[in-house]
UniProtKB/Swiss-Prot annotation:
This protein's name: Epidermal growth factor receptor kinase substrate 8-like protein 3
Protein family (similarity comment): Belongs to the EPS8 family.
Signal peptide annotation: none
Tissue expression summary: Detected in embryonic gut. Detected in adult testis, placenta, adrenal gland and intestine.
Subunit structure: Interacts with ABI1. Part of a complex that contains SOS1, ABI1 and EPS8L2. Interacts with FASLG.
Protein's cellular compartments: Cytoplasm
Pfam family, any one: SAM_3
Keyword Acetylation annotated: no
Record gene name: Eps8l3
Low complexity composition-biased segments: 204-214
Any one Gene Ontology BP term: regulation of hair cycle
Region (Disordered): 152-245, 429-452
Amino acid sequence: MSRPSSRAIYLHRKEYSQSMASEPTLLQHRVEHLMTCKLGTQRVREPKDALQKLQEMDAQGRVWSQDLFLQVRDGWLHLLDIETKEELDSYRLDNIKAIDVALNTCSYNSILSVTVQESGLPGISTLLFQCQEVGAEQLRTSLQKALEEELEERPRFGVHHPSQDRWKGPPLERPLPIQQAPPLEQRFSPEHRFPPEQPHNMTSERSISPSSRSLTHYPSAREPNGFTLPPPPRRAPSPEDPERDEEVLNHVLRDIELFAGKLKEVQARNSHKKTKLGRKKKKSKNGITQAEYIDCFQKIKLSFNLLGKLALRMQETSAPEFVGLIFQTLKFILSQCPEAGLPAKVISPLLTPKAIDLLQSCLSPPEDTLWKSLGTSWTTSWADWTGSEPPPYQPTFYDGWQIPQPRSMMPITNQDSISLRGSRMRSSLHFPRDEPYNHNPEYEDSNLPLSSPSPGRAALKMQVLYEFEARNAQELTVAQGEILEVLDQSKRWWLVKNEAGLTGYIPSNILEPLPAGAPRGHRQPSFRAPMLRLSSKPEEVTAWLQAENFSTVTVRTLGSLMGSQLLHMRPGELQMLCPQEAPRIQARLDAVRRMLGMTH
C-alpha cells in the first residue's frame, strides 16, 4: 500500500481539526470538593468569607471533602460521582456569578472558588474545590471560556435549546460580561457584599443591565435598596458553659437513640403481625403518638444547636461526625413518620447561626437535600427568622434528668476549679452574664459592706481582675488591670467610675484591692499602658499587643498593622491569622472599640 501524499494527509488533518472544533465543549476534570457555603448568613456574606471559613476548618481538621468530577456539558456545570458517574449537583453556566482562585492559603494550595445562583432558589452559594490534577488557574480559564461560548451560542428573543429544559426563568438577551473578580486574599480592601436574597422570580433577568450582572461588584446589604434588614436578635445568648452543654448533648442524643430504638422495635413487631390502622386518635400506624415524634424532632434541632456551640472543643468525635450519625437516624425516623409535613411544623427551637454554619459546612449533598426538605423552620436561624417568635424550648428527658443551672450562675468559690477540656485560652471566671444589674433584692448580699464613699473620705480605688462587657446603659465596660473608683458597694453589683469619668455597675467579684503600699486615689504603676487608637502606627500597635501579654507570634503577625486596620479586622480574619489567641484578641478589640465609640 502506497504512502498517502502530503496533500492527502494535510486535508485529512484539516477535516479532523474542523470536526473537533465544531463539537460542543466538554470539559471534565477530577477535583476535590471541599465545601459549599451559602452566602448571606451571619458569618459568610461574600466569597472570600467562604475561603476564610475553609481556612478555619482546615486548621481544626474539620474539612470533609469528596473527590468528584467537575464537568461542563450542554450549558450546565455538573458534579459527578467518581465511580458511578451519578449526578450529585448541577448549575446552569449562566447562573455563575464569579469564578476565582486562591493559591497557597492553607493546606489546600490550589483552590477554585465558584459562586453560583442555585436554579429556582433565592440563595447564592460559593463552592470551593481543590484542583490537584489540573491547576485552579487553568480550570478557571477553561470555565470562563465555556461560559463565554454558552452565552454567545444562546439564541435571542426567548428561544432556548433543549439543554435549558430544566430552567424555569427567561433567557438573557445579551451575554454575561466576564470580568476578573477581586482576589480572595484582599482582606483590607473595601468590602463587596451580596445584595439581600430575593425570590428567583421577583426580578426578571431580562430587565437587568449588563453592569449589574458584572462579576466584580456585590452591593452592601447596608446600601439603601428598599430591603428591610431583619430585626435584631430577640433573645440573649445563653451563658457559656461547655461542660453543661456536653452533659445536655449526651442526654439529648441518648433520647434520640431511645426513640429510634422504639421505632425499630415496633417495626420488627409489625413485620410479624399486621396491625390495624387508626385504632386511636393521634396515633400513627406504629402506635407512637404525634407528640413523641415532635419531641424527637425538637431534640434533633437542639442537638444541632449544641454541636454548633461545642464544635471547636470536641476532641474524640468531631461535630461533623455527630451530624452524620444524627442524619442517618433522622432519615430512618422520617421513613416511619406517618405525617410527611410534621417536621416543618416544629418551629421551636430555632437553629442558631452557629448550627446553620455547621450544617452548611459538613452536610453531604443527599443530607443537604434532606435538610432543606424539612422546611424553613429547620434551615433559618433565629437571627434571620421573620415569623412570630416561638415559645422557648424546655426539653424533658426519658430518665427524668433535668438540665442543671449554668455554672456561670454558681457562687464564685465553685468557679475557680472550672476548666475547659482542650482549651488553650487563659482561664477566666464566668460571671452571671445573663443577669444585668437591677435593684431587685436577689442582687443584695448581706456579707458585703454596706457603705459608699462620703465626701470627707478618700475615694476607694480598686483594680479590675477580669474584663467585663456592659450589656445595657446601667453597666460599665472595664478592662483587666484598670483602676476604678468605687462609688457604691451596697449591693452585689458595685457602682464604679473609671478614669474617663464614666460610671456604671459591674460585678463586685471582678475587683481586688490595690497592692499594699500603693497610694490610694492614684495609679500604683508609674508605667502607663499604651492605648490603641484608629490613628495608632505599627510601632504603637506592637506596644499595645505586648502590653496585653499576647504571644510573640501574635505580636509579630499583627504588629505590622495600623490601628485602623487592626480595629476593623473581623473575627474570621483574626481566627485565620492567630487561631490560638483569636478569642482573647477579639475581646480586647471589642473593649477598645466601645471605648472609642466604634459601631464595628
